Amino acid sequence: MPQRFSRVLIPQPRSRFVRLRCPDCGNEQVTFSHAAMVVRCLVCGRVLAQPTGGKAIFAGHVVKVLE
């Protein structure tokens, strides 16, 4: 087979897990980048991620994008 046909392109997902830091209490927690429900801080209850039908809007600081 020619060189160009030997590669198989595998699509990669665009969604990731992210580690968010709460701006009020500094708690860090992991959430999904395309969250379908409101994500609240487990310590103080502040909204960290608001769903939009696609990628969530993050109110907290994104510390790390997990692979």
Curated annotation (Swiss-Prot):
Positions annotated to bind Zn(2+): C22, C25, C41, C44
Cysteine-cysteine disulfides: none
Single GO biological process annotation from the record: translation
Xref: Pfam families: Ribosomal_S27e (PF01667)
Chain positions of all zinc fingers (C4-type): 22-44
A GO cellular component entry from the record: ribonucleoprotein complex
Cofactor: Zn(2+)
PANTHER family for this protein: 40S RIBOSOMAL PROTEIN S27
The protein's name in its UniProt record: Small ribosomal subunit protein eS27
Biological classification of the source: Archaea, Thermoproteota, Thermoprotei, Thermoproteales, Thermoproteaceae
Name of the gene: rps27e
